[in-house]
Amino acid sequence: MGVTAIYPGTFDPITHGHTDLIQRGARLFDRLIVGVAANPSPSKAPAFAVEERLELARTALAGIDNVEVEAFTSLLVDFVAHHEAQVIVRGLRAVSDFEYEFQLASMNRQLRADVETVFLTPAEQYAFISSSLVREVAALGGDVSRFVHPAVAEALRNRVRRVP
């Protein structure tokens, strides 16, 4: 059956940094499931509803045959078990990401010892991109087309137009 990996996140919205990691992960694993967290932590209320984030991710990732996009509401390790995945993929943009990601990986290992966490770093041109920065630039009327898929840029423009 091959190796199944899960790449979890809020993807609020999905950026070129995410898609870079997903494309590279798709080459490493037989099946890569992009797990969109439907209920992220209360301190991280999403700007886009889960249905919108799923649609934008599917649009941005169209054409990558071994990638699926699915929402999840459970603990990540339960989502991993449900899909019989062996690997969790996480991205590291900078050294500052490492401490938090290391803690998450350690907790996941305590909860499910048979699942490995693999860290990937983005291509240099994407290392500074984050969903929150993209949302902020868009909210202030900036052009985010270099950082996201055209459908995402349009969704952000539409969101800005709705805000009084």
UniProtKB/Swiss-Prot annotation:
Classification via InterPro entries: Cyt_trans-like, PPAT, Rossmann-like_a/b/a_fold
Pathway recorded for this protein: Cofactor biosynthesis; coenzyme A biosynthesis; CoA from (R)-pantothenate: step 4/5
A cellular-component GO term for this protein: cytoplasm
Subcellular location: Cytoplasm
Gene3D superfamilies: HUPs
Required cofactor names: Mg(2+)
Ligand binding (substrate): T10, K44, L76, R90
Annotated catalysed reactions: (R)-4'-phosphopantetheine + ATP + H(+) = 3'-dephospho-CoA + diphosphate
Family label: Belongs to the bacterial CoaD family.
Name of the protein this chain belongs to: Phosphopantetheine adenylyltransferase
Gene: coaD
